[in-house]
Amino acid sequence: MMDLKVDEEEVDSGQPVSIQAFASSSTLHGISHIFSYERLSLKRVVWALCFMGSLALLALVCTNRIQYYFLYPHVTKLDEVAATRLTFPAVTFCNLNEFRFSRVTKNDLYHAGELLALLNNRYEIPDTQTADEKQLEILQDKANFRNFKPKPFNMLEFYDRAGHDIREMLLSCFFRGEQCSPEDFKVVFTRYGKCYTFNAGQDGKPRLITMKGGTGNGLEIMLDIQQDEYLPVWGETDETSFEAGIKVQIHSQDEPPLIDQLGFGVAPGFQTFVSCQEQRLIYLPPPWGDCKATTGDSEFYDTYSITACRIDCETRYLVENCNCRMVHMPGDAPYCTPEQYKECADPALDFLVEKDNEYCVCEMPCNVTRYGKELSMVKIPSKASAKYLAKKYNKSEQYIGENILVLDIFFEALNYETIEQKKAYEVAGLLGDIGGQMGLFIGASILTVLELFDYAYEVIKHRLCRRGKCRKNHKRNNTDKGVALSMDDVKRHNPCESLRGHPAGMTYAANILPHHPARGTFEDFTC
């Protein structure tokens, strides 16, 4: 049996349109004049040069925009926001004299006399020429260490016991016109010793708020700084103070006081008015800014702040260099002894604060609340009120003038200022600039770019198919792919025999043409 087959292997006919046809229908401006069916002419050359120049300018501008984006620029937005109520800040103050003279015992003098510059290293009073006779007599009695058996000494207990007591210092206290008491102040230790914080927001007490601005709507306290309790100054040490008055810091409840570096002084004999404005600062994290976005790095404080970071860093520095910590420092390291204070802790901390700029590098938190201040003051007491105040507090007029001060802290207005860093150039701006430049120089859009990619894909696919990567075998069917016939089929449908043996009387002309109506198609094919 012999089969006749017509097999054909053909290439898928996916040929893309010509570049001229694509250019004529593309939304990309200018290329229809470059790729045309006309022969090369000056017009086409000029269009090509203009198009390439526009592409070059577009690339230049887009490169500039992309470089600017990766500079991560930012702008600062300043705004004032009115409020119906504001949280009153924490107010911390310290007497500039760390220890009360009357509270220094013989045991204190034995252990810390040299630290306080009251004794020399031989336990002797160094200079008696400038001493007050009454103080000198008391000090000589305390400095007599014959048959004295020293007892254990603890710096924390000494600071707490010998520091100024709020119950003796506070003569009057009002907040928003309502009386307050020493119980509203929380003890806090700083480098100035025993200090007090009003509105600390701790120990279960809520943070106080104010509903109005101006004097009378904040905190007003009258204090006695007790200059007669100041330690006599016969020499200079890190614990010696030449000033009289208090140091004050206004700060957020979320950060500890760093009053020795950030506080301002208030002098006796004056009423000091402090007008505040709350400022909320919002910084950007890298790469747009330098703020620290993460919190919780400190093992001593829950909320990250620059002051918390500095205290934490100073504590680690002293523990590493002196194997102890100062009274105001957090942690569980042992407190420094008076000898360690004098020989190591005070010099090391002074060096760290004033000269070392590399050990304690504290990043700015991304959200900061601070308080701008404006100070003004008036003399107190007046001549008219001096006698009244002296009688009221059972003191002399001279004592009132040398020891009494009034501190009035209030909000200037019931609003706050926001200082916010914002991204100056974001992805949306970059895309908008690039899209605008594309439209300006070449009249293109994102869809135009998709057109180009689609045409490039079709061209690449066609070229790959021409190399034999897309060939397929196909069999022709009876209608359009050809028919495979066996010899039996040919014999059964043999028209030639019928032509040779046609019935009698049926004749065909010798000159009959193929496809004549008298003959069939199949007969034409087989014969």
UniProtKB/Swiss-Prot annotation:
GO MF, any single term: pH-gated monoatomic ion channel activity
Gene3D superfamilies to which the protein is assigned, alphabetical: acid-sensing ion channel 1 domain (1.10.3590.10), Acid-sensing ion channel domain (1.10.287.820), YojJ-like (1.10.287.770)
Main location: membrane
Family affiliation: Belongs to the amiloride-sensitive sodium channel (TC 1.A.6) family. ASIC1 subfamily.
Motif (GAS motif): 443-445
Record site: Involved in proton-dependent gating: 356
Bridged cysteine pairs (disulfide): 94-195, 173-180, 291-366, 309-362, 313-360, 322-344, 324-336
Extracellular side: 72-424
Entry protein name: Acid-sensing ion channel 1
